[in-house]
């Protein structure tokens, strides 16, 4: 729900505005926060992100959906951009694999495995920027495949590849700062290959394009410098990356993350054995690490580097920080498996079995099915006024209940300085004889009951 608030409410978080705390606000106030009151006024989400910790492009995408479909409502108006991004990502991944491998079934299987995986399905229903970041990551891979194939064939790179690289790098930088880490490994390894292959002219154009994209992103959103280097998340990430006092814990955490991600595709050991066995068979057939195999190895190496660095920098061991590498890994595995039995390519469809089975063993955590009992419990009181007490330590924490607030007659959020006094003042300033609901964020139930009595 923070996504909708940051997309729609001028000034960012309403709880930080003067006069909000310790006063009553009608439910219509919160309802307005959940929709675009000024269609296509992109200065609202763009400027709001200056006080947040993320860049603004995804919020502008949500704002576009709200402006185009004002009657669609929650959650569909937020899910629509996700669905578009993920379906487009599957289509571009198919085109990427088809171009790289050259055959239908490996490309179709790669796109299907990616699209149907637990992690990608999770991002489809999680109203944050990760679906857009995945699409941008796949477009980045497509541009590299086009460039790599042209160079391999001794041809001049197509002119369109340069604006493509520029646009996707700029867009990614304006979507999630972790995309820059993905670019660092993918582009860094590709740049090393260009130098090793003595493609100096192409390498120069490549470097200029990538850095020009970063400069353009900075020019469009200069606040990103403060976000990355002096913002709360940025300073936390850099401090964690350069803290070398707990390397053993870092190694343990990487193992946990790898197992978490692999579980969404059917398990780490299953795919480790499959890929290792395929590599051994191909080696014995005379296949070596060159051509498509070298490109696939680069994708896996870039993905491994990304996991290692993000695990050090990210605040949580959550799959959403890593889904951008899923397409790269799937593409690399597709390259390897497609070489095994080119005359029996439909057997590749068996890869879907563990991926679909993973929905049973490691289900989508972003459906929030545990919220169903809460909705049922609130059904009879959803329109009553509410007083909100908050012990989280930051004023915007209760914004998580924004959709509930929008249905209520009115809401009064305590300032947190003296909850007992705030509760007393709220009760005395409004006729609540018809009853009211008391929210206690991070309160013990008995403590909250005693405070109310």
Language-model segments: which ranges?
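Interfacial juxtamembrane loops and adjacent helix segments
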Residues: 2-54, 66-72
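Transmembrane-helix motifs of polytopic, lipid-linked glycan transferases
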Residues: 77-101, 139
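Hydrophobic, aromatic-rich transmembrane alpha-helices
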Residues: 190-194, 266-290
